[in-house]
């Protein structure tokens, strides 16, 4: 084998010292989603949104810039009128505003799969070599553009739930190497909860990123003891894996819906009646307490918040008078005075119920 090939392979596969995500404190983060394409991340309302999140005890936030995906492998980026093509404000302003408040920020690009023919990101795959080639060229260009624009961010996620691309190890390793040339912060990948052990390139990243929708209980009416036992089993599994590959765990998403399946199928989007609220609240309490007490789990980015004046969506709500105190108590041991416009939420919810726009559960 030629000498330059040996050097190249060595540089791609040699382990390095990972950057810690947590420093001296756990990652206590909240993902700020969008009511439409991400434009609201550049609004003045993001400033008050960050303030509200900080009050809960958060020290991290995240946004998830979008690009579209097609069956032919092409990746498309939506351009807002008047926005800079190189560094659109909805990518960059959240970084500036978060840092002003002393918050760290993670940029977590998402492929918008709706209307593409793919049911979810884990299904994204292509039939021909031509389509795969197009995908990797387009995806690489997009990820590098976001990384360049967001190089002041504290963490960057190179991909989210792209299960059927994981056997393309060489393409992923090349992309990681290219991102590191322009971005000096922490880097991870957001693996689906059921596939994190299939990711072959954790050694090239700074942490094991997992979309944390693990089933914690088998039945739909678990007790708190059931949840604690479920988390105990999960933490043991995660701790063993983290030690094996010498990387800590970061939950790149963690969410519990108002659902009777919140513990058994946490990924379920269906919102159930108010009778499901106690289970949702119990899931949050046990999860947050467990994460705080496990050294191998760096922390989590909770799913999901929205920019003011509507910090709530139809599902996976965090900005409610029920859930916010649970988060605050877990993160800072006290519950601050938090104002919440319940009437505004109910008006908006009724508008959504009448069929305005696409479902908010797509992320």
Predicted feature descriptions by range:
Residues 4-15:
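Bacterial N-terminal signal peptides
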Residues 21-53:
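Boundary/entry segment of secreted carbohydrate-active catalytic domains
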């Amino acid at each position: 084998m030629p000498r330059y090939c040996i050097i190249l392979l060595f540089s791609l596969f040699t382990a390095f010292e990972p950057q810690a995500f947590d420093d001296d404190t756990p990652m206590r983060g909240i993902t700020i989603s969008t009511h439409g394409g991400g434009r609201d991340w550049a609004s003045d309302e993001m400033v008050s949104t960050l303030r509200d999140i900080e009050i809960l005890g958060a020290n991290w936030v995240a946004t998830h810039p979008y690009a579209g995906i097609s069956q032919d492998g092409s990746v498309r980026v939506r351009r807002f009128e008047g926005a800079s093509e190189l560094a659109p404000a909805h990518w960059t302003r959240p970084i500036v505003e978060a840092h002003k408040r002393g918050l760290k920020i993670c940029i977590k690009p998402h492929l918008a799969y709706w209307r593409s023919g793919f049911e979810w990101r884990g299904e994204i795959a292509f039939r021909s070599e031509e389509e795969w080639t197009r995908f990797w060229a387009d995806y690489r260009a997009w990820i590098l553009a976001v990384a360049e624009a967001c190089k002041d961010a504290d963490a960057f996620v190179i991909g989210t739930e792209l299960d059927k691309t994981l056997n393309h190890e060489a393409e992923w390793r090349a992309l990681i190497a290219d991102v590191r040339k322009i971005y000096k912060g922490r880097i991870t990948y957001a693996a689906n909860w059921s596939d994190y052990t299939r990711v072959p390139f954790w050694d090239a990243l700074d942490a094991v990123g997992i979309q944390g929708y693990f089933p914690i209980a088998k039945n739909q009416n678990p007790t708190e003891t059931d949840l604690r036992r479920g988390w105990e089993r999960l933490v043991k599994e995660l701790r063993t894996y983290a030690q094996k590959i010498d990387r800590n765990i970061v939950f790149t998403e963690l969410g519990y819906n108002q659902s009777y399946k919140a513990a058994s199928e946490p990924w379920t989007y269906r919102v159930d009646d108010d009778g499901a609220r106690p289970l949702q609240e119990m899931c949050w309490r046990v999860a947050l307490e467990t994460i705080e007490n496990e050294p191998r789990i760096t922390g989590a980015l909770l799913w999901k918040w929205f920019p003011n004046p509507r910090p709530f969506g139809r599902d996976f709500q965090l900005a409610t008078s029920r859930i916010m105190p649970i988060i605050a108590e877990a993160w800072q041991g006290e519950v601050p005075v938090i104002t919440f416009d319940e009437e505004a939420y109910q008006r908006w919810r009724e508008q959504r119920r009448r069929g305005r726009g696409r479902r908010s559960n797509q992320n």
